[in-house]
Amino acid sequence: MGKKENQLYEGAYVFSVTLSEEARRKALDKVISGITNYGGEIHKIHDQGRKKLAYTIRGAREGYYYFIYFSVSPGAITELWKEYHLNEDLLRFMTLRADSVKEVLEFASLPE
């Protein structure tokens, strides 16, 4: 992998609610260590807690949401996605380029 300048990303991660608190922490640590192992830097982690999913994913109606702002080389993103696909505790993930790190996140609740 060539040395390219790191870019800022926002990663959204939804973990299974069947995980214990310790298992969820280990699953989150796995995501974080994946980023740092590729030379990335974590800027901010937002723990959004347990929330209702917009639709059922693998039988789950709820998930634990985390948003992580990090910088890493663009070439590392593909490798991270490969790792995410192998992580059975991770229901969904999305990675977007970010312009800045948001200090506060606010979301509207889903209708009942």
UniProtKB/Swiss-Prot annotation:
GO terms for cellular component: cytoplasm; ribonucleoprotein complex; ribosome. Transmembrane segments: none annotated. The keyword Ribonucleoprotein applies. Keywords: Ribonucleoprotein, Ribosomal protein, RNA-binding, rRNA-binding. One of its GO terms (molecular function) is structural constituent of ribosome. InterPro entries: Ribosomal_bS6, Ribosomal_bS6_sf, Ribosomal_S6_plastid/chlpt, Transl_elong_EF1B/ribsomal_bS6. It comes from the Bacteria. One of its GO terms (biological process) is translation. The keyword Ribosomal protein applies. It holds the Pfam family Ribosomal_S6. Binds together with bS18 to 16S ribosomal RNA. Belongs to the bacterial ribosomal protein bS6 family. This is Small ribosomal subunit protein bS6. It comes from Chlamydia pneumoniae.
